[in-house]
């Protein structure tokens, strides 16, 4: 579970309301009493409804969750309800709405990709990378996890991933030498190696890589890697980059050891 604290939510509020709501204040509406309801526009996987409610609470409104994150809803279903002074409701309205819209879009995409992949193999794992809009990583990872995916890595500190950029500083035998060093230095971590073609994937597996990250491989190249590895290789194959609900199933059909 990704905990989004009040400091992060206050930063979203301050971005949109740095000095109050000029329009509401100028109309003399600030102290009026009001109610706010948010409903789904269409079918979606809900994400960050809890954070949206907290945004309204931080501004002084009373607010309640109607639909928790991770639930799939149809258009028209209530997501949250709030009441309080108009100044608080309108200050938090768009911040909360934009957060739910954006996060639920990520969650819904994750749900669709997971469903497409698991239609081929119910045991497959869909893992999302750390590549996110700067400043939104925790919210992004929260959204994709409530959508049914898991996390590939949260950052550079939690996993071992050998890129070509590392190997560029390792000399002629960088692939084998760096894999060996990582396995010795980080014995409790799987060594993941990003590869650019079939030959490099097979060489990395031979050198001891435990996960092969196939960067933007078409399905036929994924199949070639799986075939080349043979039935005795015990690692994992991960197709990375450009995975959508439309191509998740074809990718999964190309191999057994896949996540």
Swiss-Prot record:
SUPFAM superfamilies: Nicotinate/Quinolinate PRTase C-terminal domain-like, Nicotinate/Quinolinate PRTase N-terminal domain-like
Protein name: Putative pyrophosphorylase ModD
Any one GO molecular-function label of the UniProt entry: nicotinate-nucleotide diphosphorylase (carboxylating) activity
Catalytic activity, EC: 2.4.2.-
Transmembrane segment boundaries: none
Biological process terms in GO annotation: NAD biosynthetic process; quinolinate catabolic process
Record-stated family: Belongs to the NadC/ModD family.
Any one GO CC term of the record: cytoplasm
Glycosyltransferase in keyword set: yes
Top-rank taxon: Bacteria
InterPro entries: Aldolase_TIM, ModD, NadC/ModD, Nicotinate_pribotase-like_C, Quinolinate_PRibosylTase_N_sf, Quinolinate_PRibosylTrfase_C, Quinolinate_PRibosylTrfase_N
Enzyme superclass (EC): transferase
Keywords, ordered alphabetically: Glycosyltransferase, Transferase
């Amino acid at each position: 579970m990704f905990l989004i604290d009040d400091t992060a939510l206050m930063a979203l509020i301050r971005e949109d309301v740095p000095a109050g709501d000029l329009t509401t204040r100028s109309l003399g509406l600030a102290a009026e009493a009001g109610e706010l309801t948010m409903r789904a526009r269409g079918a979606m996987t809900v994400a960050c409804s809890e954070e949206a409610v907290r945004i309204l609470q931080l501004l002084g409104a009373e607010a309640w969750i109607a639909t928790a994150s991770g639930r799939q809803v149809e258009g028209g279903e209530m997501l949250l309800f709030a009441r309080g002074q108009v100044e608080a409701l309108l200050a938090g309205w768009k911040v909360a709405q934009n957060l739910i819209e954006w996060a639920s879009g990520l969650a819904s995409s994750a749900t669709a990709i997971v469903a497409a992949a698991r239609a081929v193999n119910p045991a497959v794992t869909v893992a999302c990378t750390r590549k996110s809009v700067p400043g939104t990583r925790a919210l992004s990872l929260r959204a994709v996890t409530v959508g049914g995916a898991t996390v590939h890595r949260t950052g550079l500190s939690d996993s071992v991933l050998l890129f070509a950029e590392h190997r560029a500083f390792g000399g002629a035998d960088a692939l084998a030498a760096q894999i060996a060093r990582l396995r010795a230095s980080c014995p409790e971590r799987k060594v993941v190696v990003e590869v650019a073609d079939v030959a490099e994937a097979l060489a990395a597996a031979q050198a001891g890589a435990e996960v092969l990250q196939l960067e933007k491989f078409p399905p036929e190249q994924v199949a070639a890697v799986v075939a080349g590895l043979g039935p005795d290789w015990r690692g994992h194959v991960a197709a990375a980059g450009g995975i959508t609900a439309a191509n998740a199933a074809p990718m999964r059909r190309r191999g057994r050891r896949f996540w």
